[in-house]
Amino acid sequence: MVRGKKPVLPQTPAEVRPLSGSPVAGEPGAQNQLFGDAPGNYEIKAEDGIGEGPEGQKLRANTEAIRTLRRVQAENRNATPEEQATMAKFVGWGGLRKLIDPNTAGKQWLDARAELLGTNGQPPLLDGGDKGAEWIALQRSTTAAHYTAPEVVTAMWDVVRHFGFAGGRVLEPTSGIGNFIGLQPRD
């Protein structure tokens, strides 16, 4: 990079080029439809019930979200709006510590753990099973992850708008599960 010059970043999907030189989605020879019929960012609605319910319901939502993500990845395609709705219900592992301690967990926790790690006779949902980086990250996140409820996110958007933000590009401030993007006001 030349000193004093800012890099020019792509602004549209058409400007994005893979480093390997392989074709971009939508061009002849492309393998997936990364930008083809992409449904866009999922807009979270009140009726989605994001983060609602007891621990067991959140646990089931998390495992279903991971199962859905793995299917979409395996099929090398974009998620449908219905699949996006399922994945939007992922709340992280911060409040689900019982999952990592099989000695204090009930049947639903042990079943979910077996599904994630592949000890139920099926392929694991988490890469590498109980030795993989995803399981290690999950364990660590149970003490360090913090879920931001939709009501808090909506209130934060109200404050940002009050201070003059009227739309544009934003980054997911939590680097998390997408609630800030999913609850971004349309206007």
PLM regions with names:
Residues M1-R77:
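Charged, low-complexity intrinsically disordered regions
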